[in-house]
Structures are given as structure tokens and as C-alpha cells.
Amino acid sequence: MRKQLEEARKLSPVELEKLVREKKRELMELRFQASIGQLSQNHKIRDLKRQIARLLTVLNEKRRQNA
């Protein structure tokens, strides 16, 4: 987890936005699977939401530094 955060801090804001969009798409797919009963590992939704929050935090930090 710490490595992922360090890697995210190395990315540019544009790359971070792209990664957030990809993760949100994954979250949408997981929610769909959960709604039709195909998802057996419900913790993946929570983990993915936390990843998105971390990425958004890093993105906001970068935006504040550039402002």
C-alpha cells in the first residue's frame, strides 16, 4: 500500500486523473457484479473505494502545490 502511494505521488496530475477514472470504472463493474450476486469478495469494493480516495488526496495535494 505504501509503495502504491509513493508511485502515485510520482505521477503527473493528468496521469492521476486517468488512473482515478479507471478505478471508478472498476468500482462500477464491481458494484454491478455485487448487485446481481456474482461478487463473492465484497471487501474488494471497500478496498477500491479507499484506493480512489488516496489517489484523489494525492491529486489534490499536487493541485495545491501548483496553485
Swiss-Prot record:
GO biological process: translation
Pfam families the UniProt entry points to: Ribosomal_L29
Family matches, as SUPFAM superfamilies: Ribosomal protein L29 (L29p)
Molecular function, one GO term: structural constituent of ribosome
Entry's Gene Ontology cellular component terms: cytosolic large ribosomal subunit
Keyword line: Ribonucleoprotein, Ribosomal protein
Classification via Gene3D superfamilies: 1.10.287.310
Transmembrane spans: none
Similarity comment: family membership: Belongs to the universal ribosomal protein uL29 family.
Record's protein name: Large ribosomal subunit protein uL29
Natural source organism: Thermus thermophilus
